[in-house]
A protein has these predicted regions:
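Active-site regions of enzymes building and remodeling cell-envelope glycoconjugates
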Residues: 105-111
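Active-site and NAD+-binding cores of ADP-ribose-processing enzymes
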Residues: 12-23, 55, 111-193
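ADP-ribose/NAD+-binding catalytic cleft of ART/PARP-like enzymes
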Residues: 3-88, 170-171, 178, 185-188
Length: 193
């Protein structure tokens, strides 16, 4: 990738600082996006109550459920630990292809360095699958049989509906407001090789 000063194809241009942050992003993810530019909703998205243009953040390792039952959260974590060696409900960044209903602002998400994604094509949101306490272990096992692991965004993009919850396992990520989509598209199209 070569460094550009600005991309002026859109009203919201990419500054040198934004491009410097993009240069830290996982290159394979950027290449996957480049192949998906003609698709709608081709970025990982996350809704938050943050109100900043862009930033780099660390993924919390102690996430607690806000709407889900703690027992269901812990049961799922135990199953994810058995199958994928990660407490995905506590240690993942939750994203989707369409994050408009979560939080006040929607951001485009770019994992930094190594990452992978866990998702179920059959269960869009595990919160909605919460059973009675006595049925939790069996339900969690059933769900985990459908969960897939991939670091190929094109594969995940093609295998999920826009509303599916995607658990991104990474240490840090770059997030930028959705209003930069056109400028990002142009930068990725022209600069990512």
């Amino acid at each position: 990738m070569r460094l550009s000063k600005h991309i002026n194809e859109a009203a919201d241009t990419l500054t040198i600082d934004i491009i410097d942050n993009l240069m830290k992003v996982n290159l394979d993810y950027l290449r996957d996006i480049k192949h998906l530019l003609d698709q709608r909703r081709h970025y990982l998205q996350r809704g938050t109550n943050d109100n900043i243009e862009y930033t780099i953040k660390q993924v919390r390792q102690d996430r607690r459920p806000t709407d889900s039952n703690q027992d269901w959260h812990d049961t799922l974590d135990a199953e994810f630990q058995k199958k994928f060696h990660v407490n995905a409900r506590s240690q993942a960044l939750f994203c989707s292809r369409l994050a408009g209903g979560y939080g006040d602002n929607t951001y485009l998400i770019f994992p930094i360095n190594d990452f992978y994604m866990l998702y179920s094509p059959e269960y869009p949101d595990l919160f909605l699958e919460q059973p009675k306490k006595e049925d939790m272990p069996q339900k969690a096992e059933k769900i985990l049989r459908t969960v897939k692991k991939s670091n190929d965004w094109r594969e995940v993009f093609g295998d999920t509906r826009p509303i599916n919850e995607i658990m991104v396992i990474c240490k840090s990520y770059f997030m930028i407001k959705m209003k930069y989509t056109a400028a990002l598209d142009a930068w990725i199209k022209n600069e990512v090789v």
